[in-house]
Amino acid sequence: MQKCIMRSTEFKTHFSFHSIFSFPLSAALLALISASEPASKAFINVQFISSPLVKKEVLPFIVSFHSLSSNGILSFSPFTSSNLSIAQLPFLIKVPLLSMGSLALENFNKFIPRADLVAAWVTIIMVFTFGNFLSTLSIKTGQNLWHLSKISSSVSPLLLGIILGSQSGEIMLGKNLLITS
């Protein structure tokens, strides 16, 4: 059984983040969370303790979110500090609904049904669109609506849980991860 260990990181908002989703799902969800504090920058350092597939070497994967403007529009860019080339690394991510901050990456040899991935993307797009709508409305009206945006970003993982949740109270995300150096 393969596992992923992620070093816990703190946002400048003092929000302790202990979970990671499949990329780019991770980028979308983390951007939503980061958008609740548009002036902040979040740096997430993820280390995959690799399987025999990558010869037990450690693959650091750093995702940084840079605040572009005060309305919370963010961009992200991935950086890999390894010369490894991994083709179609399948993985199964289980996120306990009662503990959204924890994650175990297990069972590299399992795939997630495409329907689950589509449902996850639909949810993310809906919440992300709502966040952008709040940003635009805040600029036009001059009112601070970031508390609503923060609520929407907090609800995003819960919506994913409701849509993708299994009877065991866990959601499964991800399909294939392609990283090339």
Swiss-Prot record:
Residues 36-58, 106-116, 175-181 are extracellular. The chain crosses the membrane at residues 15-35, 59-79, 85-105, 117-137, 154-174. Keywords: Membrane, Transmembrane, Transmembrane helix. Signal peptide: none annotated. Disulfide bonds: none annotated. It comes from the Eukaryota. Residues 1-14, 80-84, 138-153 are cytoplasmic. It is a multi-pass membrane protein. It is found in: Membrane. The keyword Transport does not apply. Partially overlaps YNL108c. This is Putative uncharacterized membrane protein YNL109W. It comes from Saccharomyces cerevisiae (strain ATCC 204508 / S288c).
